[in-house]
Amino acid sequence: QAPEHDPIPLLGFMAAATTRIGLGATFSISHAHPFYAARLWATLDHLTRGRAAWNVVTTLNHNQSANYGETLRPSDERYERAHEFIEVCRKLWDSWEPDAVVMDREAGVFADPKKVHRIEHEGRFFKSRGPLNVIRSPQHGPAILQAGTSPKGRSFAARYADAIFAIQPNIAGARAYYDDIKRGTVEEGRPAEACKILFGIQPILGRTDAEAREKAEHHNALVPLEGGLAILSGHLDFDLSQIPLDALMAERTEAQLQRMQTRYRTLTGELLTLREVAQRHGQSVGLVQMVGTASAVADQMEDYFDKVGGDGFMLSPIYSPGAIEEFVDEVVPELQRRGRYRRDYTGTTQRDHLMQED
């Protein structure tokens, strides 16, 4: 998939052009050190005036690891390392006490050295002396986002995440996922509302329902089979070229393929071939497509939201630029008229926005 420019530098430009919206990016912890990450995200939190959000991921693809001259770690080890990584970042963000900076010109003192501490961390995967060389940021570190689906990913989100992205193809699965994450968050000693759950959808709008359906059909037909296979192979970390295209996924014994078959069978109610799964994955990666006029899409969002109890949605545009602008201009006003979406911000930071009740 290319081009995929590094999103981190872009956040600085976006911060200069905006004042309130939260700004987030994905940053893998698999090929970095916590000190670098803690410094990077504290700096971004300052640049954005407290609007930074870090989507924490563990690399799950052998090809990505090979780019760094490394081999992919086993899943258990990746998550053990991830827990320690975030704990070290937290210690570094804590290394400056809230009132450490005094800026006493007369005494020539910028910060009280008694309130800036080494962390002296030495764990299984990392060592770091500290303190961080960036002062405490507006949010005391960025908001943490995550997209865990496996038991280990869900546990990680329940412990650390301010919000979690989820792809659930139907109401029953989404409700079970929602309840599981909220239960896990409480078990970690946090309030259930501390981790917001955002369900992924792909809205496709038209001036009429017929126009929207035509647009959806056109979009879905544009996806080449080879592209869908490549994306699916990357997401599964499995070479699909060795499998016949018309083989039923349900007949495969590989764990990765069984999970993907379950997702798409839940979405469609059908047993699908590799060809069909790859085509659908290339179209929406399993996201629910909500198709119709602005009013119809708002109806579908309300129905999903009310039945699941989720905290919000993650939008996946079918084209860019344009699709997000259409949603903001057409669906958001409709949701506001129904009292389902805020008309203003009540806070200034990303965490404020996530905690705001609409």
PLM features per residue range, with description:
Residues 1-358:
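N-terminal glycine-rich cofactor-binding segment that shapes the pocket for flavin-like pterin cofactors
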